[in-house]
Amino acid sequence: MEDKFPSIVVSQPEIVAHHFTEADMVEPAINYWLKAGNLALSRSANAAVGHLEQGLKLIPGIDNPMLRNKSELLLQTSLGNSLRATKGWSTDSVKLAYTRALQLCRESGLDEHTFPAVFGLWTWNFLRAAFREAHALAEYLLNTAENLDDSVCKVLAHEALGFTLFAQGKFAAAHTELERSISLCEDSEAAAYLDLSAQDPRVHVRSYDAMTLWFLGFPDQALRICAEARRCADASQHPFSEAIARTISLRVHQLRGETAAVAGQANAAIAFCEEHEFVHYVAMALILRGWARAQQGEFEKGIAEIQEGLEKERATGALLFDSYSLGLLADACIKNKSYGQALEFLGQVQSRLDDENTERFYAAEIYRLLGETYLRSSHDLDQAEHYFSKGLTVAREQKAKSLELRLCLSMCDLYDLRKGADKGRSQLGDVYRSFSEGFDTADLVRAKATLERA
């Protein structure tokens, strides 16, 4: 069949795999189930899982122990990549697949296959918000990539470290790592990136760097690199990477305060992710559509949709961006004057903010929202100032200039009530003048108007 129908071998390896399975020819059957799984992943992750599980069923039929271990290792790694897309990046089944793959590497001395298994485990820990473990794995990946002097592995290792640093709120260091990853990316290596990590770093890294740039105070650069990520995703024709680009683009627009852009793009993002059954990104897009609805005055619908997305996300085991989602919920509640609800959601995050192993990229904004809640609900100026001051300390430590600007705006509102407007505007003016772009974004427009009232 391989010789008679070469086009089927290439385009539909599952047919060949089925024939070899029926003929009880285990080794070639497994080889073709693996090919079928890897090919299907670019179109349908669910189909990929089915093909790979068929291959795993045949593993006991291989007599040679080294070949048996290597075959299972390749299948388990690909299965982990496929399950990430269908079940969510941080489900237990994903961890089991990568852990088994790594165990087989170590038992059989197959060191050359260690990198993708460890990258998979880094992903699992990262999405679980276990950043101490994620950071250690990212450092291991970088050391391994340097020792191998492998450019593809270096791209992915810098990605892993950059993503982890971002989540920890170390934005300048994250940007350095992400820029390094982007600079090493080669279009000619696109297939190799997908084989190793089941995602396209040309898309994913740019998307994360866009968020990082916004926090660092470069909202226009953030939008530009986000557009680059979308172009890379369109060119790759890889659905999972397109889902990443679509949903993180929504997040960048949200950070820039562009409600209409989020509302206008969210439906298409949700439909695309639902079509391909990318549960993690469906949840993310629902959260952002809910935020947009709340901003547009549909408070009850918006809050309910953010909660729905958050529940879907947590059901996959993911805790990454949990503080961000709760922050969006609290923001919607504050605007709806539901201050008790806002404090309830913020309380879920507040207890974790002092732990260096937890998510801290949104810590300054959480403190600002706590201050806003006390300022608006009870005019408790002392408590509001306490949280605004804590937020400013964090924002300055993290070099999160965009969040520092928001906190200074909140401080201006506080000082207006205390009849100390000049002090608040002086502080705001210093931050405002440090920006070199983004003057048409909501926060900077508001800052300019506040300063002009002086």
Model-derived regions: residue spans:
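C-terminal non-catalytic interaction modules
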Residues: 93, 100-103, 344, 353-454
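Amphipathic alpha-helical segments of tetratricopeptide repeats
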Residues: 2, 37-38, 56-64, 99-110, ...
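Extended alpha-helical scaffolding segments used for macromolecular assembly and cargo binding
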Residues: 1-117, 124, 383-394, 398, ...
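Tandem amphipathic alpha-helical repeat scaffolds
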Residues: 18, 35-41, 74-88, 113-133, ...
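Structural signature of tandem alpha-helical TPR/SEL1-like repeats
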Residues: 95-99, 133-140, 264, 380-386
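Residue signature of alpha-solenoid helical repeat architecture, marking inter-repeat boundaries
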Residues: 7, 14, 27, 43, ...
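Eukaryotic tandem repeat interaction scaffolds
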Residues: 306, 326-334, 338-362
